From Swiss-Prot:
CDD domains: RhoGEF
Name used for this protein in its record: Rho guanine nucleotide exchange factor gef1
GO cellular component: cell cortex of cell tip; cell cortex of growing cell tip; cell division site; cell tip; cytoplasm; cytosol; division septum; endocytic patch
Record organism: Schizosaccharomyces pombe (strain 972 / ATCC 24843) (Fission yeast)
Function (record text): Has a role in the control of cell polarity and cytokinesis. Involved in bipolar growth, via modulation of cdc42-shk1-orb6 signaling, and septum formation. Stimulates guanine nucleotide exchange of cdc42.
Organism ancestry: Eukaryota, Fungi, Dikarya, Ascomycota, Taphrinomycotina
């Protein structure tokens, strides 16, 4: 230890020691070359030029005793009288808190450009020749930093300099002793640094927080000639424009070479002030992979099917979230412009109705449509590693589009057809000063809530949203398996939307450039049968008037529309029948449980009701529950559900054939296909009516068995018709039959064909 004191005493008197310490270069980042370790003026870090003759190096040794453990500690202090501004203390306006000179620099990669050098002319340092082991040394600066000359700037400052690491270039035998940090009351301590200041806190007696900044441990011969000390704090995930705040438990940044530590210790009052000022600031986490990210990456590498499911879930999220953003734009139009029409008397009521007349209906429809999309796609928000590669809830987005297609066509067709007139009116409003100020005021309001900048960019949103629907559906179809039950609905809704867009596009003028549908639908290969028939170069071209007057194409278009309507109805009927069977089975189960409870109650009071009667009732309910649902399920699958599935496949193939055909299909073939589908559909409906009648007749017979004989005879005498008895037990039976008959009439193609 005496040898170490002598070596360091000789080093403290040597100016070359500080020059060597000042010019140690920052560690080279991974993937960089030596050219990146340029001179200090090119390096993106702060230089604090410290003259070699204005510091003193003092050594002290103390024993820290904690219980039975005694540890000898040695430290070296570099004393200086430099002063600066304490931003945190000044911000808190605490007159009792002195200003302590922060010394800091920032790693080069956290600055955008240039180096930052503090001038030597604004500061001067005094030399403290006292080398005794004291806890603090008070120095009075020879010159005030800046233009402020107040007595409270006199502040003690102490720089703790541990011993240098062993290195061939420095020949220093000491090793690096790490400075550990203490946790604060809330378990965290923060590193505070401004653009050019790094404030560290340390107190050996008061156990205050200590923050250390690493000094780079590499150097070059050229840089050893410079006289500067660079203090580099190297947090892993901070910005240079904000204060550097890091939790105390963050691992210290280490390099291959040993680094020295230059710590700034302040007094207890400033430590408390800074700790109080920084407790409300959020801590910045380090760069580390979370467990969820690691688990997700492992699952994606193990099971490739997860990637497809995750992509599909993200697309469904995109559809729902963009619909919410579109709804927000519609609300912005209504709030910023539509409801303020009465404030401007210069607006023509007819023009205002043309521009904003459809916004209310669009807003009402979009609110309901977004709610249905969110409920249908809710399962995509829970697609994670725990799901068995399927959505937790069914996603019937295609069916929702099919059910809303009529409203979409009715609302958006009129809105799109009036776009030319709407933009002409908006242009006219901006040319007049009275209406221009009203529009500009609305533009300022709307910019606070949306990304749009004016009325024109908001008016075009419905057209853009209509074009977005088929694009999103196409992406969802691409990641939906062929065997999925949702794929036919998605494909059909995509085709119907494309046809709707093509029909709207035919009414648009070519000169209409904003939100034009022309370029979009032409990029689609199957946008319309008429466009495909005329786009074939091998066939002679015909005009649109000739196509409209062609009776064969009109009939083909009508048959295509009828097939699509029938497909949607049959799809809904298939789902309804499955739900009906589940309801019937549940009803019999509930009936059996009720009778079982009554049997148990009768056993408690056998004198009121014979136990055998309740046992007979329970047995009858059990027979009905066990036999009737099984018989219904067999008949339902063989006579109804399977035929409906076959009809849906045939209709889908016919629709795709008509859309993809580049020639006019003969009317006789279409009539034959329509007749076959209609007969099969009628057969399915009649089978379902027969199953319902058989079920409720057996249901009624069972209840007649439970009714006493005298009451049974009176009921039969009054009704005189067994069908009325069935109707009495199940009123909804005949209502369902009437609805099915009306459904058959609406789907029938006999009158049209």
């Amino acid at each position: 230890m005496e040898t170490l004191k002598a070596d360091l005493s000789d080093m403290s008197d040597s100016p070359e020691y500080f020059e060597t310490l000042a010019n140690r270069d920052l560690p080279r980042l991974p993937g960089t070359s030596k050219l990146h370790r340029a001179a200090c003026i090119k390096r993106k870090s702060i230089n604090l030029s410290l003259p070699s003759n204005s510091y003193s190096l003092s050594y002290r040794q103390s024993d820290d005793t904690d219980g039975d453990v005694s540890e000898s500690q040695s430290e070296y202090r570099l004393s200086s009288g430099r002063r600066s501004r304490a931003s945190f203390a000044r911000a808190l306006q605490d007159p009792q808190t002195p200003n302590t000179p922060p010394v800091s620099s920032q790693h080069r990669r956290f600055f955008s450009e240039g180096s930052f050098n503090l001038p030597n002319s604004n500061m001067s340092h005094s030399l403290n020749g006292d080398s005794t082991a004291s806890n603090s040394s008070t120095l009075t600066p020879n010159r005030i930093y800046g233009d402020r000359n107040r007595q409270d700037y006199a502040q003690s400052s102490r720089y703790t300099l541990p011993s240098l690491p062993s290195s061939p270039s420095y020949n220093c035998p000491t090793t690096l002793r790490k400075i550990h940090t203490n946790t604060s009351s809330n378990g965290t301590s923060r590193r505070v640094s401004g653009l050019g200041s790094f404030m560290a806190q340390n107190s050996s007696e008061t156990s205050s927080n200590r923050t250390s900044a690493y000094l780079p441990g590499s150097s070059t011969d050229e840089q050893e000639k410079r006289s500067s000390v660079t203090l580099a704090s190297m947090p892993s995930s901070h910005s240079s424009t904000a204060s550097l705040l890091s939790p105390l438990d963050t691992t210290s940044f280490s390099t291959k070479l040993d680094s020295t530590i230059l710590a700034l210790e302040t007094d207890e009052s400033l430590s408390r002030t800074i700790s109080y000022a920084t407790t409300s600031l959020p801590s910045t986490p380090g760069k580390r992979l979370s467990k969820e990210s690691l688990a997700m990456s492992e699952a994606s590498s193990i099971n490739p099917e997860y990637k497809r499911i995750k992509k599909r879930a993200n697309l469904i999220k995109e559809l729902v979230t963009t619909e919410a953003a579109y709804l927000n734009d519609l609300i912005a139009i209504q709030q910023s412009y539509g409801l303020r029409v009465k404030e401007c008397s210069a607006l023509n009521p007819v023009d205002a109705q043309t521009v904003f007349g459809d916004i209310e209906s669009l807003l009402t429809f979009t609110v309901e449509f977004h709610s249905r999309l969110y409920q249908a796609g809710e399962g995509s928000w829970r697609v994670n590693l725990d799901t068995q590669l399927i959505d937790p809830l069914p996603c019937n987005l295609g069916l929702i589009f099919l059910e809303s297609l009529s409203e979409i066509g009715q609302i958006y067709t009129g809105y799109c057809n009036r776009q030319d007139s709407v933009f002409k009116i908006i242009t006219k409003w901006r040319e007049k000063p009275a209406t221009a100020s009203w529009i500009m005021e609305g533009d300022k309001i709307v910019q606070k809530y949306t990304n749009a900048w004016d009325l024109g960019s908001l008016i075009i949103k419905p057209l853009q949203r209509l074009l977005k629907y088929p694009l999103l559906l196409q992406k969802i179809i691409d990641v939906t398996p062929e065997s999925s039950s949702e794929r036919p609905d998605l494909v059909l809704s995509y085709q119907l939307l494309q046809e709707l867009i093509s029909g709207i596009n035919q009414k648009q003028k070519p000169s209409h450039k904003r939100g034009s549908l022309s370029a979009s639908h032409k990029r689609d290969a199957a946008w319309s049968l008429l466009y495909k028939a005329t786009s074939n170069k091998s066939r002679p071209t015909t005009t649109s008037t000739e196509l409209k007057t062609d009776a064969r194409l009109n009939f083909q278009r009508q048959v295509l529309q009828d097939f699509r309507q029938r497909f949607a109805i049959l799809k809904a009927l298939h789902a309804t029948l499955e739900t009906w069977y589940v309801t019937v089975h549940r009803g019999f189960s509930v009936f059996e449980k009720v009778l079982a409870e009554l049997e148990g109650l009768s056993a408690l009071e056998p004198e009121d009701k014979p136990v055998d009667t309740w046992r007979k009732y329970h047995l009858l309910a059990h027979m009905m529950t066990a036999n009737l649902p099984s018989q219904i399920q067999t008949s339902l699958n063989s006579s109804i559900l399977n035929p409906i599935t076959n009809i849906l496949r045939v209709i889908q193939k016919v629709i795709q054939f008509i859309i993809s055909a580049e020639f006019v299909i003969p009317a006789q073939k279409l009539e034959a296909i329509s007749t076959l589908v209609e007969k099969e559909f009628h057969s399915v409906v009649y089978h379902f009516i027969g199953i319902q009648r058989s079920l409720y007749e057996n249901y009624a017979q069972g209840f007649l068995f439970l009714i006493p004989q005298d009451m049974r005879d009176s009921i039969l005498e009054e009704t005189q018709d067994y069908a009325e008895l069935v109707r009495a037990f199940e009123p909804m039976h005949y209502d369902d039959e009437v609805l099915l008959e009306e459904l058959m009439k609406s789907v029938s193609l006999a009158a049209r064909v």
